[in-house]
A protein has these predicted regions:
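An N-terminal alpha-helical hairpin/helix-loop-helix interaction module that forms a charged
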Residues: 1-132, 148-235
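Contiguous, well-ordered alpha-helical segments that form the cores/surfaces of helical PPI scaffolds
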Residues: 139-146
Length: 235
């Protein structure tokens, strides 16, 4: 790995920290989204909700993290859960969120099983609604919302470009060749580099109010560095 390139990207992230978190860009929304999900998902109050209602309430702060003008995966989950509540809930609780004891290969297998299963639900319930489709970015975002200390959000283009720029040296892969352990390994290296940046961490904690998830693992911050490097052309 090219440590100098990694540190340069983190420095550019730090130099632009106030700008990317201003009212226009508001990248800190990711921490609000996780806090919202955690507060809803693990609350006793949701016991009386349907799964569709629970998921909708939990993801209401996700904003552009998953949805945009072309796709609406979170709304898709809600709509599919209204049609097949038991199956959609099973796919989340017993498959995607299943305890894997830290086994990343098993976690990746669970993700693929979840995606196959939820696509089958979509084909049965909304066959012409491609915007309700789910992908790895969706699945790993749901995992990061559910267990942020153990997971990283994943986006293919951002991960590939970051890995190339820091000369990671391990192929993350894509499609059938995707390797979760390789991606998480790269993110772990970003976390290690962030932990020795006290000035940046101080800036970050200063804007993390009560409405934000307190990311002790720095997993969200690591993804934010990877994401913002591409989104704001730090390369």
């Amino acid at each position: 790995m090219n440590t100098a390139n990694l540190n340069t990207l983190i420095q550019r992230y730090e130099d632009n920290f106030e700008w990317i978190n201003n009212a226009e860009h508001d990248e800190i929304f990711k921490w609000r989204a996780v806090r919202c999900f955690q507060d809803v998902w693990f609350s006793e109050e949701v016991e009386d909700m349907t799964f569709a209602e629970k998921f909708k309430a939990a993801t209401k702060e996700c904003s552009v993290l998953l949805d945009n003008g072309q796709v609406s995966p979170t709304n898709g989950i809600v709509k599919m859960a209204e049609q097949e509540p038991d199956e959609v809930e099973r796919l989340f609780v017993e498959v995607l969120f299943a305890d894997d004891q830290g086994n990343l290969q098993l976690r990746q297998d669970h993700v693929e099983e979840f995606l196959d299963g939820i696509e089958a639900v979509r084909e049965r319930t909304f066959p012409s609604y491609w915007k309700y489709g789910q992908n790895r970015h969706c699945a790993f975002t749901y995992l990061a919302l559910y267990a942020p200390e153990e997971n990283y959000i994943y986006k293919y283009s951002e991960a590939e470009e970051f890995a190339k720029h820091i000369e990671y040296g391990i192929d993350i892969g894509s499609g059938q060749t995707f390797k979760l352990s390789a991606y998480y390994g790269m993110c772990d290296l970003v976390v290690d580099a962030l932990r020795i940046r006290p000035a940046l961490l101080e800036k970050h904690w200063a804007i993390c109010g009560d409405e934000c998830y307190h990311d002790d693992s720095l997993h969200l911050l690591a993804f934010d560095v990877i994401y913002c490097s591409r989104a704001y052309n730090f390369y």
